[in-house]
């Protein structure tokens, strides 16, 4: 999934992080060099609290002029991410591969037996669903399908 493609659809990319603003001042330029940029990145620095509280999502909504939580999707790789999204009452999607919850490097994933990897992914999926995730995907490549599904639900009031 290319972020540029989402932007062409009018989707704004907001980010929340547990890192401090000083840390993000180092991380964001490096991420941009690798092709990842956000329209807004919110840290807990100037807010009452970070995750799992919803304040960083709400600050993104304010700064990006998004009027409704129905129009927000929280995508994350930790249980704290999932709880942040649920507490903000936004669509919440967990990701498994590359996640802190799975705790494996790409090389470890590639070297793991398919049966073991399937079992580990099922454990993470279950934890994310129990934390309240609306959807859980293996990778970001599945996100366009989830966005399409959510848009369909919003357009049909389901």
Where are each of the predicted segments found?
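Asp-based, Mg2+/Mn2+-dependent phosphohydrolase catalytic module
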Residues: 20-21, 25-158
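Conserved ATPase "switch" residues in P-loop NTPase domains
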Residues: 7
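Short, small-residue-biased leader/transition segments that mark boundaries at the very start
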Residues: 1-2
